[in-house]
Amino acid sequence: MKRERLMSINKEKAEAAIYQFLEAIGENPNREGLLDTPKRVAKMYAEMFLGLGKDPKEEFTAVFKEHHEDVVIVKDISFYSICEHHLVPFYGKAHIAYLPSDGRVTGLSKLARAVEVASKRPQLQERLTSQIADALVEALNPKGTLVMVEAEHMCMTMRGIKKPGSKTITTTARGLYKESRAERQEVISLMTKD
């Protein structure tokens, strides 16, 4: 799949745009250190945007019927994404909890794969959090879903306010975890426990 996505971008157009950008900032794209930069940057963005055109829900290919009716939590799923406002990285960890319905569970790696697909595109952290939750709800129809994303945004670290180390935390709850504050708080305490 990686090869398919890398080949699906318009490589010539991307390289030409990067070449023009280098000229626009006063650089000489033909100097030794920059000769292959347009090609390298186009290839890098193709890899960083592997999630474009994919639905995170499609990552839930393994669904099992088990006798498990209690919460399932996978935390500290590392990810990186690209802020769609400034095209610089934001990165951090996603924590996912769901309460199975009728014993329907998924492979744990599928949760990480859904995060990967949703994050590898120009993105907003708020949307990323919701897309992960929605994919899980559509795939498993759990009684409750809660997703928490913690990230550092380079657009706040490198430019503007310049506050390195600051983190943004977003949460999205569905089902029981949206309806019941007590249930939601219990899951959040498990997610944030070291």
UniProtKB/Swiss-Prot annotation:
- GO CC annotation: cytoplasm
Write the record's keywords in alphabetical order, separated by commas. GTP-binding, Hydrolase, Metal-binding, Nucleotide-binding, One-carbon metabolism, Zinc
Extent of the signal sequence: none
Residues noted as binding Zn(2+) in the record, renumbered to the chain: C83, H86, C155
Look up the EC number in the record and give it: 3.5.4.16
The record's top EC class is: hydrolase
Task: Name the reaction it catalyses.
Answer: GTP + H2O = 7,8-dihydroneopterin 3'-triphosphate + formate + H(+)
**Pathway annotation from the record:** Cofactor biosynthesis; 7,8-dihydroneopterin triphosphate biosynthesis; 7,8-dihydroneopterin triphosphate from GTP: step 1/1
Tell me how this protein assembles.
Answer: Toroid-shaped homodecamer, composed of two pentamers of five dimers.
Q: What is this protein called?
A: GTP cyclohydrolase 1
Q: Which organism is it from?
A: Streptococcus pyogenes serotype M5 (strain Manfredo)
What broad taxonomic lineage does this protein's source fall under?
Bacteria, Bacillati, Bacillota, Bacilli, Lactobacillales
